[in-house]
Amino acid sequence: MMDINEIREYLPHRYPFLLVDRVVELDIEGKRIRAYKNVSINEPFFNGHFPEHPIMPGVLIIEAMAQAAGILGFKMLDVKPADGTLYYFVGSDKLRFRQPVLPGDQLQLHAKFISVKRSIWKFDCHATVDDKPVCSAEIICAERKL
């Protein structure tokens, strides 16, 4: 549904911090998105986390979910960062990690819009690998006009 070129129009992030490779489902009416991140042994964070037992840092799993949620928010508003709007990650609730993400995994990212009040957006997010739960959280973002 969205390749990396279109994703780059909706996310201001760039290598090595762009953590969404493809959007496979985007349902504006249903207010949900499904995307993925292919996790390669060549990711720069594996050099230090951990060299003998590489696992994707949990904070980057959260960031990947937040980026997927950000794409959903931009699409719901029909704006792009180039239009002068950004989303800042400001927090999470009900955060849980279930299993590690390893090199070679495809991290599936799911986000569903919950609410927006005074430019604070909430999304129900979860990540899976091979349909097994990896992480879940309510992601909170602040919408800012530049």
Swiss-Prot record:
It comes from the Bacteria. The active site is at residue 49. It catalyses: a (3R)-hydroxyacyl-[ACP] = a (2E)-enoyl-[ACP] + H2O. Keywords: Cytoplasm, Lipid A biosynthesis, Lipid biosynthesis, Lipid metabolism, Lyase. InterPro entries: FabA_FabZ (IPR013114), FabZ (IPR010084), HotDog_dom_sf (IPR029069). GO terms for biological process: fatty acid biosynthetic process; lipid A biosynthetic process. GO terms for cellular component: cytoplasm; membrane. Its EC number is 4.2.1.59. One of its GO terms (molecular function) is (3R)-hydroxyacyl-[acyl-carrier-protein] dehydratase activity. Pfam families: FabA. It is found in: Cytoplasm. Its main location: cytoplasm. It is an enzyme of class 4 (lyase). Belongs to the thioester dehydratase family. FabZ subfamily. Involved in unsaturated fatty acids biosynthesis. Catalyzes the dehydration of short chain beta-hydroxyacyl-ACPs and long chain saturated and unsaturated beta-hydroxyacyl-ACPs. NCBIfam families: fabZ, PRK00006.1. This is 3-hydroxyacyl-[acyl-carrier-protein] dehydratase FabZ.
